[in-house]
């Protein structure tokens, strides 16, 4: 096993699966972290486990959080409908501070493991407009990580890696195919059923379908 370790945020979706494959291709021993945070699309947790097995991660950790106790998002509050048509501004599927919370916990695990690199599959090209997916956020979090940790102040700095940041969804899928990602294992839908079948209507489904079309690859998604 490689001495070079990385912690990777793995939702079970298309983007994060590709990031695991990219990190593995760079020679990292991969440690993946998923979150059971009260999301309505819980099928993504089973997808994350499947992806972790397929791509040979060293350890896959699922952390429980109660973000539905805070609410404020269609993904954590069942009284808020998931939009089926694009809207203006930041959509109601934005989960307040989600990537800040997730990266903070990944940072803690990375410090324990002695990993210096943390990978996240955020994208600022084909995305829903979430503020915590932008390059400015990633750069700011990296600065904070190196101010707020024992490892950081002792000169063992962390890097927050976002390799998909400037890639289109089609480019991401093409890269993942070259690296052996089985996209049939992944779940992207915001309201997937218990079997992981997708609605085909939400923003995440639309972006995913457009990505497969742009990549010229058969869509591996199962729909209900």
Swiss-Prot record:
* Keyword ATP-binding set for record: yes
Its UniProt entry gives the catalysed reaction(s) as: 7-carboxy-7-deazaguanine + NH4(+) + ATP = 7-cyano-7-deazaguanine + ADP + phosphate + H2O + H(+)
Identify the pathway: Purine metabolism; 7-cyano-7-deazaguanine biosynthesis
Query: Is Ligase among the key words of this record?
Result: yes
Q: What's the top EC group for this one? A: ligase
Binding of ATP, residues? 10-20
Query: One matching Pfam family, short form?
Result: QueC
Per the record, the domain of life is: Bacteria
Q: What cofactors are annotated for this protein? A: Zn(2+)
The family database entries (InterPro entries) matched by this protein are listed as:
QueC (IPR018317), Rossmann-like_a/b/a_fold (IPR014729)
Which key words tag this protein in UniProt?
ATP-binding, Ligase, Metal-binding, Nucleotide-binding, Queuosine biosynthesis, Zinc
Query: Which Gene Ontology terms describe the biological processes this protein takes part in?
Result: queuosine biosynthetic process
Transmembrane domains' residue ranges: none
- Listed CDD domains: QueC-like
Q: How is the cofactor bound?
A: Binds 1 zinc ion per subunit.
Q: Which GO terms describe its molecular function?
A: ATP binding; ligase activity, forming carbon-nitrogen bonds; zinc ion binding
- Residues that coordinate or bind Zn(2+): 189, 199, 202, 205
Q: What is its EC number?
A: 6.3.4.20
What family does this belong to? Belongs to the QueC family.
Annotated function: Catalyzes the ATP-dependent conversion of 7-carboxy-7-deazaguanine (CDG) to 7-cyano-7-deazaguanine (preQ(0)).
Question: What HAMAP family would the database entry show?
Answer: QueC
Name by which UniProt lists this protein? 7-cyano-7-deazaguanine synthase
Q: Which organism does this sequence originate in?
A: Ectopseudomonas mendocina (strain ymp) (Pseudomonas mendocina)
| Gene assigned in the entry | queC
């Amino acid at each position: 096993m490689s001495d070079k370790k990385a912690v990777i945020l793995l939702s079970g979706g298309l983007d994060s699966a590709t990031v695991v494959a990219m990190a593995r291709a760079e020679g990292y021993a991969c440690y993946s972290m998923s979150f059971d945070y009260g999301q309505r699309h819980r099928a993504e947790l089973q997808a994350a486990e499947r992806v972790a097995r397929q791509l040979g991660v060293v350890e896959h950790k699922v952390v429980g959080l109660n973000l539905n106790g805070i609410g404020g998002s269609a993904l954590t509050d069942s009284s808020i409908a998931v939009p089926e048509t694009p809207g203006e501004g930041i959509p109601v599927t934005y989960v307040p501070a989600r990537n800040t919370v997730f990266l903070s916990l990944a940072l803690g695990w990375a410090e324990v493991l002695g990993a210096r690199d943390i990978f996240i599959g955020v994208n600022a090209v084909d995305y829903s407009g979430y503020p915590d997916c932008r390059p400015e956020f990633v750069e700011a979090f990296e600065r904070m990580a190196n101010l707020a940790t024992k490892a950081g102040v002792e000169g063992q700095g962390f890097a927050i890696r976002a390799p998909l940041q400037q890639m289109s969804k089609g480019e991401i899928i093409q890269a993942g195919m070259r690296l052996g990602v089985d996209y049939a294992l992944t779940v992207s839908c915001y309201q997937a059923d218990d079997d992981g079948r997708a609605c085909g209507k939400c923003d995440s489904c639309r972006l995913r379908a457009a990505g497969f079309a742009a990549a010229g690859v058969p869509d591996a998604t199962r729909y209900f």
